Amino acid sequence: MTGTTLAATYGPISGADLEAELAQPRIADGDAQDAAVYERDGGARALPFASGGAPPDGDRADVRRAAGAGDASVRLTRVSKRYGERAVLADVDLSIGRGSFVSIVGRSGCGKSTLLRLVAELETPSAGTLVKRGDGGGALDTRIMYQEARLLPWKTVLQNVMLGLGRRAKDDARAVLDEVGLLARANDWPAQLSGGQRQRVALARALVHRPQLLLLDEPLGALDALTRIEMHALIERLWREHRFTALLVTHDVQEAVALADRVLLIEAGRIAFDQRVPLDRPRARASAAFAALEDRVLQRVLTGSDAAPAAPNAAGPEGASRGRAAPASGLRWAV
């Protein structure tokens, strides 16, 4: 993992780790020991907090981001990944526009999370090239969130967000907790929070670094339906305000269509389907256009062929094939 990548997660923290940490004498900067644990277990180096700037102007900014504004943040060229004799990804070509929101769907084991880990530089390609360009052509500061928040249980909510930043970052941490609606819980312990609240803290911990690329590996998979919808709205609002590039891996087709400018399907280690989502934000999930687009993506996942003509205002990219589709009848999951 490079110095510009933050896995917004902790590796397994055993009881021995906890006992050893509690037995350590407190030092001038009490966070230093925990930052070392964080780095050891797949954490990251802290970067200075930078102002997110003014939010973009409404839907016009979303259109520019969906098109990538001609500026790729991430580009993969003929990327393959093998584990021994098993090929997981094969000759993947992908360009992700700066400031866009891309979702990846597919059946279990198709290579979705492997692709995300390659982009995060937690894995290296077996073949091909991966190029990440930050603002001005520099390094692309990246954060990644997983399904488990993995907060340090002996740290308060505020201290978890501040981890690795030092005590002077307290104001920044409080500001981002306010953004995710948890400032009032800043001094609570992680055990006092619900699952959705813990994921909000994990999101705050990633956003306090003001990343240019946020990778989301099924971060909402363990939450109930209503909490997921609330988190969708929160992630979308923060994405529009902070203008980072987002790449989401999910089994939930409705979630993919609700959040993304573009939905990719991975089959047999390749990108088999690339569907633009030209729907206005916030997405009206009860609309015919949304339902038809969700159905089209789901049918493509389930049947391996592009289903019926897309709904009005939900056309796919040029060259996408079209056919008939049966209603998805409430099916949302591509497992």
Curated annotation (Swiss-Prot):
Q: Where does ATP bind?
A: 106-113
Q: What SMART domains is this protein classified in? A: AAA (SM00382)
Kindly report the protein's main subcellular placement as a broad class.
membrane
Q: What is its EC number?
A: 7.6.2.14
Top-level EC class as recorded in UniProt: translocase
Q: How does it sit in the membrane?
A: Peripheral membrane protein
Q: Where found, per UniProt?
A: Cell inner membrane
Q: Which domain of life is it from?
A: Bacteria
The coiled-coil regions, if any, are none
Which InterPro entries does the protein's record reference? AAA+_ATPase, ABC_transporter-like_ATP-bd, ABC_transporter-like_CS, ABC_transporter_ATP-bind, P-loop_NTPase
Region Disordered: what ranges? 308-335
In the record, what terms sit under GO molecular function? ATP binding; ATP hydrolysis activity
- Keywords carried by this UniProt record: ATP-binding, Cell inner membrane, Cell membrane, Membrane, Nucleotide-binding, Translocase, Transport
**What are its GO cellular component terms?**
plasma membrane
The set of disulfide-linked cysteines is: none
Domain ABC transporter spans what residues? 74-293
Question: According to its UniProt record, which reaction does this protein catalyse?
Answer: ATP + H2O + aliphatic sulfonate-[sulfonate-binding protein]Side 1 = ADP + phosphate + aliphatic sulfonateSide 2 + [sulfonate-binding protein]Side 1
Self-association state and partner proteins as the record states? The complex is composed of two ATP-binding proteins (SsuB), two transmembrane proteins (SsuC) and a solute-binding protein (SsuA).
What the protein does? Part of the ABC transporter complex SsuABC involved in aliphatic sulfonates import. Responsible for energy coupling to the transport system.
Task: Give the record's family classification.
Answer: Belongs to the ABC transporter superfamily. Aliphatic sulfonates importer (TC 3.A.1.17.2) family.
Q: Which PANTHER family match?
A: ALIPHATIC SULFONATES IMPORT ATP-BINDING PROTEIN SSUB, TAURINE IMPORT ATP-BINDING PROTEIN-RELATED
What's the protein name?
A: Aliphatic sulfonates import ATP-binding protein SsuB
* Organism placement in taxonomy: Bacteria, Pseudomonadati, Pseudomonadota, Betaproteobacteria, Burkholderiales
